[in-house]
Amino acid sequence: MGEKLQKILARAGHGSRREIEAIIQQGRVSVDGKVSKLGDRVEVTQSTKIRLDGHLLSIKESEENVCRVLAYYKPEGELCTRNDPEGRPTVFDRLPKLRGSRWVAVGRLDVNTSGLLLFTTDGELANRLMHPSREVEREYAVRVFGQIDDDKIKQLSRGVQLEDGPAAFRTISYQGGEGINQWYNVTLTEGRNREVRRLWEAVGVQVSRLIRVRYGDINLPKGLPRGGWTELDLKATNYLRELVELDVETVSKLPVEKDRRRVKANQIRRAVKRHTEVSGRQVAGRQGSARKGSTRQNVGNAAPAATASRRSGPKKRG
């Protein structure tokens, strides 16, 4: 009977299921030369040819796919888009390159928000984690500017009316601060656009800093620099998969990637060592030639050589 085309493409990392459903509806996907419709089922074999805008896509059979997840520390100023017409930096710029697949972002953070952003090669996993029905908890550290009293905290906990419907924080905990700049940690179970900021603004308080520190039970890794990423191990990856009722993985590419980096590092060290040895032999050869030449010079030439040596020494910093 096969499997729905959008699920196959999502699992292969060609986008989230919602993104893929949109491009199928636009008539941009074909299977074995026939334009596909939303809801089509496909039995993937070695001879199956799926194309997007005429370009052949890499589709592995389900047992060959390995789910990978990255934790990325998004800095402020980066956009959650693959390509920006104005050439501004995006969250995809720093991610490791993939062959035959691509990273799918699990949700979004607005340009002025920093913190934890997950990426995966499994679009179905991304789609389920983002879906409001799953109620996956997100935690944010928020620095707010303004007068805050118990009534406002109660409002935010009970719920306020936003333009796109009612919203509330699941938890609010005070973290300290100075003057009217105060830090709070808040949690939500959905990811509406600018929801944290809009909730605070609804009670007359401005957000001056916003950092996502947790997604489900995955915390922003300690020591990870802004703009840095780390790949989750098999245990953490399977936690996310079980959270949204997907089959667990039995293998991980993480050890393979570590081995590749170790081999690359060893190759670099060997190249540097060879370069040092060659340079050393060349310097020794030049010095030997210079010593032989100096025996044919008279002693009066030593003073100019010493002067030249002093001139070639380190310059004073102005």
Swiss-Prot record:
Residue span, S4 RNA-binding domain: 3-75
Enzyme category, top tier: isomerase
Gene3D superfamilies documented for this protein: Pseudouridine synthase, RNA-binding S4 domain
Reported function: Responsible for synthesis of pseudouridine from uracil-2605 in 23S ribosomal RNA.
GO biological process, alphabetically ordered: enzyme-directed rRNA pseudouridine synthesis
Annotated segments matching region Disordered: 271-318
EC number: 5.4.99.22
The protein, known as: Ribosomal large subunit pseudouridine synthase B
Keyword RNA-binding: yes
